[in-house]
Amino acid sequence: DYFEVSKNHNIVKTIHMETEWDSNDPIGETEWLHKLFEMTGFPNALVAQAWFDRNDIAKVLENQSKYDLTRSIRHKPKSTNNPNTKLDNIKGSLKDPIFRRGYSLLKKHKLHFDLQTPWWHLNDATQLAKDFPDTIIILNHTGLPSDRSFDGLNQWRINLEEFSEQPNTAIKISGICVPGKKWTAKLNKEIILDVINIFGYERCMFASNFPVDSLCATFDEIYNGFKNITAGLPENEIQCLFHDNAIKYYNPV
């Protein structure tokens, strides 16, 4: 239960991320979440499911946008396993014309795009942001910097900097677990401060990625780590990272 694991922190509103509900029923999760909101007062906004390469994507987006809590859409684009593999001609990727055609419909419904992709595809995400400047892209999981080698982090920074140059981009700091290692502030401090430096505090926000990130730490360990790492920042910047930016981008009720 989210509120049990987060009870030591002042959670005032929640934003639900789609959980890859039955792809044949993308509206089902949205309906259920609205019923949950009516019963509990949570969640207060949601990122809904819609696969841009569906034949009926126009209808799916129209239906998702009718729900009061829907703010953004997530469709995880196809990706490669490493930066040395080409993405060209892969259906469902950021470069796929069918994917991009479906993506183009977000503007009509004033919906954001929550993007989960590894850093080596951020050049394609940058092009997407350029081609559709009226749609905000919120990069999930910090661009997945799991390769903590010198070269890996250097290329992650380069690609992230290029992506951040587009004014219609933002980033969520979450999902920075390293396989086989415990989440610690020492391990992740450099990553977090780099992201804030690259995007500026006005376009960054912390996210829990729970329950997935419970595989590498408790909620307290992660959020106390976030707080300790940013403790030296001005109070207004901390307020933006933990609260105001989430309000700005997701407009929770």
Where are these regions (language model features)?
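Conserved, mostly hydrophobic/aromatic
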Residues: 14, 46, 106, 141, ...
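Short, small-residue-enriched loops and turns at beta-alpha junctions
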Residues: 21-24, 54, 145-148, 178-181, ...
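Active-site gating/metal-coordination segments in enzymes
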Residues: 24-120, 127, 172-177
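Catalytic pocket-lining loop regions of alpha/beta-barrel enzymes
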Residues: 89-205
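Mid-to-C-terminal alpha-helical segments outside catalytic/metal-binding sites
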Residues: 1-8, 12-13, 193-194, 198-205, ...
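Short, electropositive alpha-helical surface patch
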Residues: 26-42, 126-138, 188-199, 222-231
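An N-terminally biased module of ancient metal coordination in phosphate/nucleic-acid-related enzymes
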Residues: 1-37, 224
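Active-site metal-binding loops of divalent metal-dependent hydrolases
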Residues: 19, 50, 77, 142, ...
